Amino acid sequence: MEGGLADGEPDRTSLLGDSKDVLGPSTVVANSDESQLLTPGKMSQRQGKEAYPTPTKDLHQPSLSPASPHSQGFERGKEDISQNKDESSLSMSKSKSESKLYNGSEKDSSTSSKLTKKESLKVQKKNYREEKKRATKELLSTITDPSVIVMADWLKIRGTLKSWTKLWCVLKPGVLLIYKTQKNGQWVGTVLLNACEIIERPSKKDGFCFKLFHPLEQSIWAVKGPKGEAVGSITQPLPSSYLIIRATSESDGRCWMDALELALKCSSLLKRTMIREGKEHDLSVSSDSTHVTFYGLLRANNLHSGDNFQLNDSEIERQHFKDQDMYSDKSDKENDQEHDESDNEVMGKSEESDTDTSERQDDSYIEPEPVEPLKETTYTEQSHEELGEAGEASQTETVSEENKSLIWTLLKQVRPGMDLSKVVLPTFILEPRSFLDKLSDYYYHADFLSEAALEENPYFRLKKVVKWYLSGFYKKPKGLKKPYNPILGETFRCLWIHPRTNSKTFYIAEQVSHHPPISAFYVSNRKDGFCLSGSILAKSKFYGNSLSAILEGEARLTFLNRGEDYVMTMPYAHCKGILYGTMTLELGGTVNITCQKTGYSAILEFKLKPFLGSSDCVNQISGKLKLGKEVLATLEGHWDSEVFITDKKTDNSEVFWNPTPDIKQWRLIRHTVKFEEQGDFESEKLWQRVTRAINAKDQTEATQEKYVLEEAQRQAARDRKTKNEEWSCKLFELDPLTGEWHYKFADTRPWDPLNDMIQFEKDGVIQTKVKHRTPMVSVPKMKHKPTRQQKKVAKGYSSPEPDIQDSSGSEAQSVKPSTRRKKGIELGDIQSSIESIKQTQEEIKRNIMALRNHLVSSTPATDYFLQQKDYFIIFLLILLQVIINFMFK
């Protein structure tokens, strides 16, 4: 045996020498012929398992004594060396017939089938699969067994947004389990240590910081939890390929690093050294005592100097895992670079282990199953697009005499200040598309947001956001037109393809309320790193000769890689010249674009044309770019043509935005859902007859078809009221605490180029096809109160969707919207808090009244007389005012 080993294998030799304390005088099954196979760096996995001594059930290693660190198990004596040589000589005397390839199963040596050259490849594959299943079973046993704990303590872990969270970490052989609480009930995630590296990380904060990472930036997370959990507890998002961890002190941190390094080796050493030939040891040490003993060893190793006290990894391993069942990580993941040099040299790589890495994500499949084709919505390129001319020409319209009579009839039904949302408007002023479609005009230049997401300077990032915001206004219909009021439950879907980044920007909108009319929308491009959501309440006010369409609400733009939210509002549309003059449509109002995280903001003012203004005064806009209260730059120009920016420090002015013909030519092309795949409540199919009549200039037919849709909506509302039912939205849900509408299937994780493959949409649900399924957690946005938390389910796709088949063969999981806010504060608790506040206010009010009465009773008589005098004077003044009014009436 010793002759077969290379000179560069001292660790392997010491490991066999140390095994005497634990294993006793067991016989090693090897011979002189087999020793020929032990090359300096290569040896098959099965040969390595035969080379290891087999422990017996009746021999145990004595427990360590804290008072004698150099006791048995940490120092090899001369007797141990001599006995080890005797064992080696016995193993060398074995006949050649006793040495066979190990078949990977746990059957008894007397009944196990030995692989021979004549055995077929089918039998070898069967043994290979059984070995994989056995390794999986051992790993699950290690994770679920409460007695196997290498180390457990509270640690602070830094999330994706660079904020720290205190979590309970339990270290087991090959895995690191992370929980929210010490009771191990709220599982957050499981880190697979077999492919991880550990490095100390400098930090300005107190404590000891180190990093656990994958050298190739692959995912370090397991698919499921120790009890089969598919989704972890709600916490801040954690990185996919690394973890930055901070311990309270340097000694604790180095203790954790030593424990993690040992756990990395345990993932492969356990499988090789703890194989039983039909027998398993009974547990002899409880979990508590095992944990304390091991923790003490690691702490002693950090407190003592290296010259006086050094621990051998294999000795610590045997001390902690002595007399326990077989625990190992998956056999398909043993090619970890963190393993010992001795392990790599002795065990080597076989032909089978070279192919195991491709199957490490799911060992439950015996044969790789074919990947199902991606099921996504079919989109077609938009054939026609109307772009209005710049200036006042495209915003004015001369009304015919026939239409004027309709306007006068309409004006008789309204009065100044009245809300026109419930008034049925004539069809000649309708633009042949829905308001949900109209809201998508802002994303033909979504590539500006792709550039902004990559911009490192926050000021330049704000400038790109403002530039994108202005790019959504120059597209306007010719004349004075108003889009359709969406029907309750109406939806609209479209997308834009980015040729530069090969990504897609998806737009989803739904009419979530009819009275009041609220439209919710969601835009997502995870690959380019941004998403946008919001809701708009449309109101109309009549002022006699003019009316205004007010868009209440806000949109929230989020850069996923930075955790920044840009909150922006909308201008209002103002139409004048209804009774006299030319009917003209303009934009007015003040728009705010604010990023609370960076402190940068923009203020844009859309100006209406003055009464005596010229044509140059139409569509004017001015604005400021600010950092806090400091103005960095100003904007001036026209929102449908040139806009200039002037830097306040240098006073230099340049063109900020100008929709030239070249810009319009390179705008992104919109793709809409194929008409045959649209649902009955999608905008294009729902309003198709009205649109056809308007395009044919048949106002009578358009009015009739519009009435049919509106009457069907009213009848449906009456039916729901009769049945005492409430309307349930398909794609959006209302947050009762913030009053905001949110997309049910929103995925705000940063794009992982190593795991995320493609983003797609099916039936209104935006999803991401991933290579490997990983647990996905979500954190509430900063704008929300800390009560809104959303749980997501990660199956084959990163966004949960009912009735969607996993592309890798796993079953889809149905998600109910009601389960997304289990962590939110109950409304009953809020009501009880309000009642408590009311009671406190009543008590304060009673105390104030009592104090006031006391002051009045102690007031001197002169003050009382003056008060009566004042009342008398006030009475005379009021009487005089009444007399004067009566005389001049």
UniProtKB/Swiss-Prot annotation:
InterPro entries recorded: OSBP_sf, Oxysterol-bd, Oxysterol-bd_CS, PH-like_dom_sf, PH_domain
Tissues in which the UniProt entry reports expression: Widely expressed. Expressed at higher level in macrophages.
Modified residues (N-acetylmethionine): M1
Region span, Disordered: 1-129, 322-399, 771-823
GO molecular function (one): phospholipid transporter activity
Compositional bias (Basic and acidic residues): 73-88, 95-109, 116-129, 322-336, 346-363
Name the record gives this protein: Oxysterol-binding protein-related protein 8
Organism in which the protein naturally occurs: Homo sapiens
Lineage: Eukaryota, Metazoa, Chordata, Craniata, Vertebrata
Gene from which this protein is expressed: OSBPL8
